[in-house]
Amino acid sequence: MKIHKAWGKVAVAMSLLLLCPAIKAGGGSLTAEDIAKIRRVHSRYEETWLKGDADGVRALFTEDCVLLPPHGDKPRIGQKGLNEYWFPPGAPPTKITKLVVVPQSIGGDGETAYVWGTDEVAWTTTQDGKTTSASHKGIFLNVLKKQADGEWKISHHMWDEPVERH
């Protein structure tokens, strides 16, 4: 029993030693203004998709962004990868009809932030005169980077939806 307690104290001490330099180097904690701006990025994400504003969506992401699509699909790197995944040339017209993004937690330091939460999206696709609808509820994780102008942009975006249980 004493051995387990001793190892537990060692593990806590090692964790603190490893984390403290990373926390110190991070530039402090998020300010209330940072958190408000990060929330606004997520609101604009909803708004731009619902308006069908592809340029508005692109503007929310860094040039070197990484999209991590669901189900282990390959990562899409940079604005080029974002365009290939979400806005491929010649793809059938797709309209987002519902998008609700609900951040559950926001954390980070003065330069990098993370946000995780839930989302619900619905869309229609029209091809050969036929319109089909689809939707899902899921989860997301975003990493954001503070820009030189003080605004925040999404650098990494990961999302998934529940797996059907049989």
Where are these regions (language model features)?
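Boundary at the C-terminal end of the N-terminal hydrophobic targeting segment
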Residues: 25-27
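A short, structured loop/turn motif at beta-sheet edges
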Residues: 106-114, 144-151
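A short hydrophobic beta-strand element
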Residues: 111-123, 138
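Bacterial N-terminal signal peptides
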Residues: 11-22
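Bacterial N-terminal signal peptides that target proteins for export
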Residues: 2-12
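A solvent-exposed, acidic/Ser-Thr-rich amphipathic alpha-helical stretch
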Residues: 32-39, 54-109, 118, 132-135
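Short helix-adjacent coil turns
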Residues: 45, 52-53
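Short beta-strand edge/turn micro-motifs at domain boundaries
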Residues: 137-165
